[in-house]
Structures are given as structure tokens and as C-alpha cells.
């Protein structure tokens, strides 16, 4: 570390990490080269929010606990054999054990706490002592692909909002939101893709500038009047990054009787200490206060969140389609006395759950070669294999035209149980026959149909009341391990913060081998099938129909399913 960084082992401004490209391996096989490259890709300065501090996205979502741990993980992956498995505990490599060639090469557990102690206060104490790391969802599981990772899900949500509230017509309408970080930064592009204009309030000017450079936001404004004028005067959908405090701007719109068509938020409200700037505070003052009085920061942040949520509720009563986009801001406001904070819905029960019932979710893949042509070829293969889905084809065309790759070229594409395995097998065959220059890794967000328990987000309002049952993501992780995913992760607190979620992830490497084909057959079937199982078990008819069509064996439901075939 450089001298100026003092004692913080997580900060090193001298380091610049980029994933290797091409076909020369640093590790002993592609099965260990894959996690090595994707770990490094998470910390590429074109990908990560604060790479020098190992922060990938989502407040303090890290890829490794500290730089010594990062270096040791790299060292181990370079020497790991194909019958060994590396264990990673909250970003720290803690053991290498003998397994077998079809076992995962890496097993990861991040941020998990015994429920009674599963809160930010206890986590932050452990974090300060170097005993824990916040892994968010795809930060600590090494499958973050930049803002593209959530663009399609956000796009699908905005399209669904247009259908539900505006008869499918987005023209001339605009969205108000907050936050342009790693997740929130996807919102402006998703909105304009769906035909809406957007004003996105962000307190960190560097984030607005970054989204401008990468094409995720169109314009920058420093006053609300300027932002409103840009939206009003544009004949086509336009996105504006507005420098300001979300609570201030949302409240000002209420006071001025200006009502957006859609209102949402993607600030890092899940982490009141590190993720939300209190009203009246500068970025520098907030950083100083985090060192001096953490409780004061948390209190001030949550008070400001309450102001913002009250404004969102007021805009809802005036006709705005208002939705929570999964950052737990409603819960924070509720704890500050806003008793009706949950009067506006979360985006999953309102718009996404029917997709989850069919195992449809954020399937993603990355080209380990580093060559964009590998992604373009896989885009075409998806179109060939799913020829009768013009909506999906339109997404792929828009993605190629409008989304800049960050780090290793990658693609996000929402597909479900009936398609994931087929696509994985096709990609593996393309590697085998040389159509692609190097292997592909396939993963997903932890925000998926069967891999998360999050009562204020993905599992909000389950029809059987099982919102908080977290057996499901644990079973998902166990099954993906048994099936032979290349690496598997089990996390706590992603998206909505400590105490509010448990979730699992998997990544599988398509290296062109027959062994990979067998693993793909298991993993890319079983993984989405757990989502169909979970929703069928909760009573959703769409999930039961999908389970019957796909021949799932669900012992307590098989008699009912047999009548649906």
C-alpha cells in the first residue's frame, strides 16, 4: 500500500486491476481461469464503482475483504487443481480442500450472520475488525458485469408499468428517480429504451459524469428547473442526471405541484451509513462524520429517507405510478415513523413475479476472450434458438446498439427454465467447434426466481405468506453445488441490507468439453427449476403450469400437476 493510505488494508490507490484477455492461461485450466478473470473483472476501473477500495457497487459491496486477501485468492486460483475447491469466507480465502472434477472450484459465503445479530451495527463492528465483508449480490460472487446487469430488468419493469398504467404508451411521459450508482446507473438508459424520459437525482457528480461517458445518461443538470426544461423541450425520450439530494428534489416537486408519471428510487438506502447522503450535508462532511459519529450519520440519513418517502407517497396520491425498486427505503422510512411507507408496492410483486413463476430472470454471460465478437455471435445464437420472441430480439438489438461493454464483454438476457439449458449447451458447442475464441461463463444476479428470500423485495407479498422463509436460497445453493456449477455463493443482506435478505448465486464455465456439457445440463436446468418449484409451492398457478409442462418432480404437487399436462 502507499504511505498516504495509513492502516486501511482495503485501500490502495496504486493498484489497477484488469482481467486478462485472450487464450493464454494464468491458471491451470479454464475452470480456474474463469473465476480468476471474473474476480479481476469485478475490479476493473471500467466496471467497479471504487476499485481502489475493492468496492464494486451497492454502497460497500466488495470483491475481496482486503488487498492481501485479493492477492492470496489470485495466487490460489493460479495453482488450484481440477480436483480441489477453494473456500472463501467473506472475501477471505480460508481453505483449499480435495473434492473432484465435477465439484465447484470455488465456494463462497459472504456477509452471513446468525439472525439475532444480523444487523448493520454488528456487521460494521466486524467489518472494522477485518472479520467480515459486505458482498452485495454479484460483487462478492464475482459476476458483476457493470450497469448492463440490471438494465434489462429495469427496462422490463418500465415496459410493464407503461402497459399497466398508460395503455402501453410511454411517449411524452417521464420518470423521477434517485441514484446513479452501479445499479441505479442503469435506470436512465432503461427508461429511454422503454420510451420514457427520466430525471435521476444523484449527489455525487462523478457518478453523473461516468454515466455520461458510458452512454447511460444523456444530459447533466445542476438545477431542477434546468432538468425539467430539458425533459419538456425534448421531442424524443431523454435522460437527465440532476446533481442534488434526492430528498430535497422529491420534496420540492411536491411543493411545486409537479407530478411525474412514474416515481421510484435506487439510492443505496439499504445502507444508511455508507449509501445515502443526508439533507444539507456535503459529500466531504458525510465522509468526515462517518469517521467521527456513525450513529449520527445513520440517524440523519434515515430522517432524510423519511422525507423522500413522504414525497413519494404524496406524488402517488397525485397520480404518479410509484414503486419501490428494491433498496429498502420504505423500511428505513417506516423505522422513522412513516407508518404508511409500504403504501406503494415493490417492483417484484407489482410487475416481475409472473416472470419468476416460469423461472425467467437475469441470465447473463461473459466472454473470457475479451473479444466483443464472441458476444455478438452468442446474441445471434439466442435469436436462432428462440425465434418466436420479438420482444427478446428487440432487446438484443437495442443492447448491441446502445449498451457499452464494461470490462469483459457480456450480455444480460431474461430467459427462463425452458431456455437456459439450451442456450448453455449451444454456447458450449460454439466453444468446442471454435466459433468462439475462448470459453464463456454463464451466471446471473442473485435477484432471480429461486435464489433469494427478501420480504421487502423479491419475496414481498407471497400469496402463501412465506415471504421470510429463507430455506429456498439455501436449497438453491446446495443444488447448484451438487450439480457442479463452477462457483457457488451464499450471501446475506444484498440489495436491502443486513437482516433483510438471504440469497445465492452460481456461475458455470462453458469450456467446450463433454464434462461441461453434463454440468450445464444439470445446473442450467436445476437452477431456474428451483424458482418454479418455490413459486408452485407457494400456490402460483403460472408456476404450477410451468412445472407440469417442464416435467418437474414436485412430490407434494405431482398429483395436481398431472392434471395440468
UniProtKB/Swiss-Prot annotation:
Reaction catalysed by this enzyme: 4-imidazolone-5-propanoate = trans-urocanate + H2O
Entry protein name: Urocanate hydratase
PANTHER family: UROCANATE HYDRATASE
Sites where the protein binds NAD(+): 58-59, 136, 182-184, 202, 207, 245-246, 266-270, 276-277, 325, 495
Keywords per UniProt: Cytoplasm, Histidine metabolism, Lyase, NAD
Cofactor(s) for this UniProt protein: NAD(+)
GO BP of this protein: L-histidine catabolic process to glutamate and formamide; L-histidine catabolic process to glutamate and formate
A molecular function (GO) term: urocanate hydratase activity
One matching Pfam family: Urocanase_C
Record-linked NCBIfam families: hutU, PRK05414.1
Pathway stated in the Swiss-Prot or TrEMBL entry: Amino-acid degradation; L-histidine degradation into L-glutamate; N-formimidoyl-L-glutamate from L-histidine: step 2/3
Protein localization: Cytoplasm
Function, in words: Catalyzes the conversion of urocanate to 4-imidazolone-5-propionate.
Keyword Lyase annotated: yes
SUPFAM superfamilies (alphabetical): Urocanase
Domain of life of the organism encoding this protein: Bacteria
Entry's family note: Belongs to the urocanase family.
Major subcellular site: cytoplasm
GO cellular component: cytoplasm
Active-site residues per Swiss-Prot or TrEMBL entry: 413
Co-factor: note: Binds 1 NAD(+) per subunit.
InterPro entries referenced in this protein's UniProt entry, alphabetically: Urocanase, Urocanase-like, Urocanase_C, Urocanase_central_sf, Urocanase_CS, Urocanase_N, Urocanase_Rossmann-like, Urocanase_sf
The protein's Enzyme Commission number: 4.2.1.49
Amino acid at each position: 500500500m502507499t504511505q498516504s493510505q495509513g492502516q486501511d488494508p482495503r485501500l490502495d490507490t496504486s493498484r489497477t486491476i484488469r482481467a486478462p484477455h485472450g487464450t493464454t492461461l494464468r491458471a491451470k485450466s479454464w475452470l480456474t481461469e474463469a473465476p480468476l478473470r471474473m474476480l479481476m473483472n469485478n475490479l476493473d476501473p471500467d466496471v467497479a464503482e471504487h476499485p481502489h477500495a475493492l468496492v464494486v457497487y451497492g454502497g460497500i459491496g466488495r470483491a475481496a475483504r482486503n488487498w492481501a486477501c485479493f492477492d492470496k485468492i489470485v495466487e490460489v486460483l493460479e495453482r488450484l487443481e481440477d480436483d480441489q475447491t477453494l473456500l472463501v469466507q467473506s472475501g477471505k480465502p480460508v481453505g483449499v480442500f480435495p473434492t473432484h472434477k465435477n465439484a465447484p472450484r470455488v465456494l463462497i459465503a459472504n456477509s452471513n450472520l446468525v439472525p439475532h445479530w444480523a444487523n448493520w451495527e454488528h456487521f460494521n463492528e466486524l467489518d472494522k475488525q477485518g472479520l467480515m465483508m459486505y458482498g452485495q449480490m454479484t460483487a462478492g460472487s464475482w459476476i458483476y458485469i457493470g450497469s448492463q446487469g440490471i438494465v434489462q430488468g429495469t427496462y422490463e419493469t418500465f415496459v410493464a408499468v407503461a402497459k399497466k398504467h398508460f395503455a402501453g404508451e410511454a411517449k411524452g411521459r417521464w420518470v423521477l428517480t434517485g441514484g446513479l450508482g452501479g445499479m441505479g446507473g442503469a435506470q436512465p438508459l432503461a427508461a429511454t429504451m422503454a420510451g420514457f424520459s427520466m430525471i435521476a437525482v444523484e449527489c455525487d457528480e462523478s457518478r453523473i459524469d461516468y454515466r455520461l461517458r458510458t452512454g447511460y445518461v444523456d444530459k447533466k443538470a445542476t438545477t431542477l428547473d434546468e432538468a425539467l426544461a430539458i425533459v419538456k423541450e425534448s421531442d424524443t425520450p431523454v435522460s437527465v442526471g440532476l446533481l442534488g439530494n434526492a430528498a430535497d428534489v422529491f420534496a420540492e416537486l411536491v411543493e411545486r405541484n409537479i407530478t411525474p408519471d412514474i416515481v421510484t428510487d435506487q439510492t443505496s438506502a439499504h445502507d444508511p451509513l455508507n449509501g445515502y447522503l443526508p439533507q444539507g450535508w456535503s459529500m466531504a462532511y458525510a465522509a468526515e462524520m462517518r469517521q467521527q459519529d456513525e450513529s449520527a450519520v445513520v440517524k440523519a440519513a434515515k430522517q432524510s429517507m423519511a422525507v423522500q418517502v413522504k414525497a413519494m407517497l404524496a406524488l402517488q396520491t397525485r397520480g404518479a405510478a410509484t414503486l419501490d425498486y428494491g433498496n429498502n427505503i420504505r423500511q428505513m422510512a417506516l423505522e422513522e415513523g412513516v407508518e404508511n411507507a409500504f403504501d406503494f408496492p415493490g417492483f417484484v410483486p407489482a410487475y416481475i413475479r409472473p416472470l419468476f413463476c416460469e423461472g425467467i430472470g437475469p441470465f447473463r454471460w461473459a466472454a473470457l476472450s475479451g473479444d466483443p465478437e464472441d458476444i455478438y455471435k452468442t446474441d445471434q445464437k439466442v435469436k436462432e434458438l428462440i425465434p418466436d420472441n420479438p420482444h427478446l430480439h428487440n432487446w438484443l438489438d437495442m443492447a448491441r446498439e446502445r449498451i457499452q461493454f464494461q470490462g469483459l464483454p457480456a450480455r444480460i438476457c431474461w430467459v427462463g427454465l425452458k431456455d437456459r439449458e439450451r442456450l448453455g449447451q449451444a454456447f458450449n458447442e460454439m466453444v468446442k467447434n471454435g466459433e468462439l475464441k475462448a470459453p464463456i461463463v454463464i451466471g446471473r444476479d442473485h435477484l432471480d426466481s429461486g435464489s433469494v428470500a427478501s420480504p421487502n423485495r423479491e419475496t414481498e407479498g407471497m400469496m402463501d405468506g412465506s415471504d421470510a422463509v429463507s430455506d429456498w436460497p439455501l436449497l438453491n445453493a446446495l443444488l447448484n453445488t451438487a450439480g457442479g456449477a463452477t462457483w457457488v455463493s451464499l450471501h446475506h443482506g444484498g440489495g436491502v441490507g443486513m437482516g433483510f435478505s438471504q440469497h445465492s448465486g452460481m456461475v458455470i464455465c462453458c469450456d467446450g468439453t463433454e464434462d461441461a456439457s453434463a454440468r450445464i445440463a444439470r445446473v442450467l436446468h436445476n437452477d431456474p427449476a428451483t424458482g418454479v418449484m418455490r413459486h408452485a409451492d407457494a400456490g402460483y398457478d403460472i408456476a404450477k403450469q410451468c412445472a407440469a409442462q417442464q416435467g418437474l418432480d414436485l412430490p407434494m404437487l405431482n398429483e395436481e400437476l398431472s392434471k395440468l399436462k
